[in-house]
Amino acid sequence: MTSRILLCSYRGEAYLEEQLASIEGQTERNFRLLLSDDASPDRSFAIAEAAAARDARVTALRRDKGSGSAARHFLERLRDPAFFSAADVDDYYLFSDQDDCWHRDKLARQVRAMRAMERRYGSKVPLLLHCDLRVVSADGTEIAPSYVRYQKMSPARRRFCQLLVQNNVTGGAMIMNHALMRLLVAHPVPENAVMHDHWIALVAAAFGKIGFLDRALYDYRQHGDNVLGAKKGGALSEMKRRLGLSGESLKEMNEKSGAAYRALFLQAEEFRRQ
């Protein structure tokens, strides 16, 4: 069994070296890391090449032209032979963001928990396990020890109908077994997917099982370039967020609410067609 990690970078030079060091320093040593750069204009690919030169477990690739979005880049590389092979039925799969920082035991703990899930449900069942994370500032100062509690999320809400309207699975927190990855490779994530992690959670809920490891296993860095950041949750703020009511005017509220629900409906319709 090998753990296969996919890290897609774009303009990541500020934090990429720290994240690579955290992955290379994992207590679980049996892994392969595919680092794909999205035609970054900065030093991201040079950092990736240096990692590949010093560590045989790392493969560095670079797109000639930018993909246009982080989600599209990730989904394209899912099917890359350097990441997924249909023959390697015992492998596990993880994603990494370029600006996170893994705790030394992240991989070991998630592998152990996934093995326990496979013993319980069987390795042929599509399985996804996700963990908690620590929210930190750009310089690594702790903002919250638990992302789940900071956002007032409930990982127990793992049924398909619940995840359809509110995702609580973060891409960098996931580990997936081969059965789930085989489904994702066979049925590409559509353009209408809200985010790749949301779609993957829906697939796991519909066709397999989702587990949660209640332990923060990496640092989720908040800075100006985050695609999606962590914001403190609460009953009122959560209601406003779900309804898109964070605009300053009624028109903005209506537009945001309409756009949010259209995206969810389109994703649900796409899933039905699949």
Could you tell me what each predicted segment is?
Residues 1-233, 246:
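Nucleotide-sugar donor-binding/catalytic module of glycosyltransferases
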Residues 153-154, 220-225, 229-273:
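Catalytic core of nucleotide-sugar-dependent glycosyltransferases
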